[in-house]
């Protein structure tokens, strides 16, 4: 079985990931659970050959030098995949994350009107956060697609690697892949300010320099979308501020309070009857929220979100209650993800 057959099988099963690991049969993750494919275990040289076949020379060199590498790979007519190849105690390994070839719209994903309102802001910082595999890329792709269909703007994305490919519809879209089209996030962001973008997507705000440049871009009149691995709006503010040295924290709080438009923290939950659905905590940069950021009163944010329902804000628990009421998720699954489980 070659790699394209394995990937086609994986996509057909609706898997989010295909795992190849020397010494074990191939496995797929479906609806959050890792399951074995009914095939014999793969030897190290088989796994090594499967991943080497789809790498270019630079990726092979990286893999040999650093013992791991990231790249993207497309099976025409099936999907694109984000690949991480690595070594483990039994030999070679690789994980293929499925990137659906079709960008789903906000309507198809069941995203409310508030997401359109957040996308429509002319400038500022919009952060979509959550753990790995929580659907951040899918949410952001839908928001960019909405803008691509409704505005005459220049959208510039900086990703590692490029996940969803956006055609230029009403917007001009330029997508840059780290290590292929640019040396790094901070380098690409620095030159982005001279590339006349209206909207900038920063695939990952990993380090101080990238976060600083994203804040500067938002402050200078661009709409900047970024992602972090935080699990709530309050933790997101802390994470951004904590990256900076003590003497800069007050200045960063001030910058954030002026430029932050929204924080959307999401998680995926198993649906009744199969599949998964996203649950969101949504914080909007209202005057009250901006004040809390400026005065370092992050602990009071949760209650400000609770009382901001009329403005489109919601806590994760409010969202979970709505999903339970619609019959989409079970109380048990809601309880697992809830901030206050006894409410379920």
UniProtKB/Swiss-Prot annotation:
Single GO cellular component term: cytosol
Consequence recorded when altering residue 163 to Q: About 50% loss of ATPase activity and twitching activity
Gene Ontology molecular function, alphabetical: ATP binding; ATP hydrolysis activity
Consequence when changing residue 229 to A: About 80% loss of ATPase activity
SUPFAM superfamilies found in the cross-reference section: P-loop containing nucleoside triphosphate hydrolases
Localization annotation: Cytoplasm
Binding residue positions for ATP: 82, 133-138
Disruption phenotype: Mutants retain surface pili but have lost twitching motility. In a mouse model of acute pneumonia, a decreased colonization of the liver is observed but not of the lung relative to the parental strain.
Keyword Nucleotide-binding annotated: yes
A Pfam family reported for this protein in Swiss-Prot or TrEMBL: T2SSE
Effect on the protein upon substituting residue 135 to S: Complete loss of ATPase activity and twitching activity
InterPro entries: AAA+_ATPase, P-loop_NTPase, PilT/PilU, T2SS/T4SS_dom, T4SS_GSP_E_ATPase
One GO-annotated biological process of the protein: pilus retraction
Keywords: ATP-binding, Cytoplasm, Fimbrium biogenesis, Nucleotide-binding, Transport
Family: Belongs to the GSP E family.
Record text about domains: The N-terminal region is responsible for proper localization to the piliated pole.
Subunit structure: Homohexamer. Interacts with PilU.
Function text: ATPase component of the type IV pilus (T4P) that plays a role in surface and host cell adhesion, colonization, biofilm maturation, virulence, and twitching, a form of surface-associated motility facilitated by cycles of extension, adhesion, and retraction of T4P fibers. Acts as a molecular motor to provide the energy that is required for T4P retraction while antagonist PilB ATPase activity is required for T4P extension. Also promotes PilU retractation activity through direct interaction.
Designated name of the protein: Type IV pilus retractation ATPase PilT
Gene source species: Pseudomonas aeruginosa (strain ATCC 15692 / DSM 22644 / CIP 104116 / JCM 14847 / LMG 12228 / 1C / PRS 101 / PAO1)
Gene (name only): pilT
């Amino acid at each position: 079985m070659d790699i394209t057959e394995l990937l086609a099988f994986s996509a057909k099963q609706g898997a989010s990931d295909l795992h190849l690991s020397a010494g074990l049969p191939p496995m797929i993750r479906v609806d959050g659970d890792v399951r074995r494919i009914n095939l014999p275990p793969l030897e190290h040289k088989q796994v090594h050959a499967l991943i080497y076949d789809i790498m270019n020379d630079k990726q092979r060199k990286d893999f040999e030098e650093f013992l791991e590498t990231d790249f993207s790979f497309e099976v025409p007519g099936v999907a694109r995949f984000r690949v991480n190849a690595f070594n483990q105690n039994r030999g070679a390994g690789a994980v293929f994350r499925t990137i659906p070839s079709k960008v789903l719209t906000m309507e198809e994903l069941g995203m409310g009107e508030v997401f359109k309102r957040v996308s429509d802001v002319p400038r500022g910082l919009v952060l979509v956060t959550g753990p790995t595999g929580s659907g951040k890329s899918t949410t952001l792709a839908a928001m960019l697609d909405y803008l691509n269909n409704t505005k005459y703007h220049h959208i510039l994305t900086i990703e590692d690697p490029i996940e969803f490919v956006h055609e230029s519809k009403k917007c001009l879209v330029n997508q840059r892949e780290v290590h292929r089209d640019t040396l790094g996030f901070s380098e690409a962001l620095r030159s982005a300010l001279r590339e006349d973008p209206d909207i900038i997507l920063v695939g990952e705000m990993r380090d101080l320099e990238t976060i600083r440049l994203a804040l500067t871009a938002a402050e200078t009149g661009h709409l900047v979308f970024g992602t972090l691995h935080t699990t709530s709006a309050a933790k997101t503010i802390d994470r951004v501020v904590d990256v900076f040295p003590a003497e800069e924290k007050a200045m960063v709080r001030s910058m954030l309070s002026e430029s932050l438009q929204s924080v959307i923290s999401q998680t995926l939950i198993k649906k009744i009857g199969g599949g998964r659905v996203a649950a969101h905590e949504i914080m909007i940069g209202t005057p009250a929220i901006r004040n809390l950021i400026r005065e370092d009163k992050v602990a009071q944010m949760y209650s400000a979100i609770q009382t901001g329902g009329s403005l489109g804000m919601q806590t994760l628990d409010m969202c979970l209650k709505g999903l339970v009421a619609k019959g989409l998720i079970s109380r048990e699954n809601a309880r697992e993800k809830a901030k206050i489980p006894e409410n379920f």
